[in-house]
Amino acid sequence: PPASRPTLVADARARAGSAPARDDLPALLDELRETAGSSAQLPDATASPDPSVDVEEVRALLDELEVKGRAPKAGYDRDLFGPAWADTDRNGCDTRNDVLRRDLTAVTFKQGTNGCVVLSGTLQDPYTGQSINFERGQDTSSAVQIDHVVALADAWQKGAQKWSAETREQFANDPLNLRAVDGPTNQQKGAGAAATWLPPATGDRCEYVAAQVAVKSAYGLWVTAAEADAIERVLEGC
């Protein structure tokens, strides 16, 4: 993003924690057709005002994002974004545990892991507004999942196809783009962008779309026209 308006991305990174530095990103894909189905029913964009979000700054960054149709999903594979939850910041802990430690309260850790493996904690889920108890276990861990605010498949269709493997792995593990959330709600979201999915909790929508804009600005990803319109509708209520 331009040096004159770095605050949104800088503040988002400060809230999320340290993230690996990235090299200059490759050029975006040439202009492609608008995605089929862009006229599908849009989600309710009602949002509750959020004084922590600088709406004009978000709009300024949104206006700088390229607007065009998504690329085909052909060739997408989760493995192209590296192994799940790598230790890209080299702090000795995998990314999933880093985010759990950041987003949960009353956290307990497995002994002998140097404070890396989270055993339990409480999540105030941003997507539903509910309080969720997390307990590590084969049948319980999925209650809290780590969401990519900008989904990997969405990124793939909006610029990430041309990235290096290193940049894709950075993106998949960047704390700026990660949130601990309610597992079932995360599954409902899937790879949806703002044009097709928004958090059920209206109080989170301003921060959610602000984070999406910050991530796309930081990584040079584009938005579709329907996506930009959906974000703007949310911002009108912020």
Task: For every predicted segment, state its role.
Residues 127-238:
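Domain-level detector of nuclease and nuclease-like folds
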Residues 5, 19, 39-40:
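Compositionally biased regions
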